[in-house]
Amino acid sequence: MNEFLNEAKAGAKAWLVKAGTSLAVILLVVIGARVYSSSKSAESVIDNPTEEAITFKLDGKDYTLEPKTSQVIKLSKGEHTLEYLGETTKFTKKAPKFLDTDYSIINPTKSLYVLYNEIYGENLTETEADEKSSTYDCEDDQGKPDKCPRKFLSDVFIQESVDYGLDEATPDNVDVAKSTRYTIKKKLFRGDDFSKYMGADSEDVILEPVEVK
């Protein structure tokens, strides 16, 4: 009997050690992801998509950006001040949400950007794809309230949760769980890049999934 109890205790101890190790691994993964997310969220992209060089001040520091260029800087959360062409604008960078794919742009020229819901799905009709990806408020051709897969942005400071930033290409394929049949990835475009991406006659893009699980 004692031998049986000892074996049971040893087995329980081994299980606890294994469970503890698994929990520790999970915690390390979560913490690592959080640190990576916070590190990326601390960065902001100053972007100049125009044909002219621009000069401005951010929090009292002078910057010059050549045409069609950008610069990545560290920008802390809180209030900041931008001075451009005699106009002073104050904006606030929010703290990122837990494990959020936070992305921010400083847009001195107030140029147009587009946040687009790219849908990847299996056996989806164009109507289904449009309904599932249209999560942003917009207006239809008659000016009535509607839902669209894109959101237009032109603020001095843009902060959004995205999967792909300005210079990151969307993949041709992504993994899609069988239980959902589709997934949506958010991509942020410069206005001109979005027009080229969509094409003159296209309204939406439906991409094929890979390794449907």
PLM regions and their residue ranges:
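Short loop/turn and low-complexity linker motifs enriched in small/turn-promoting residues
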Residues: 2-22, 28-67, 74, 85, ...
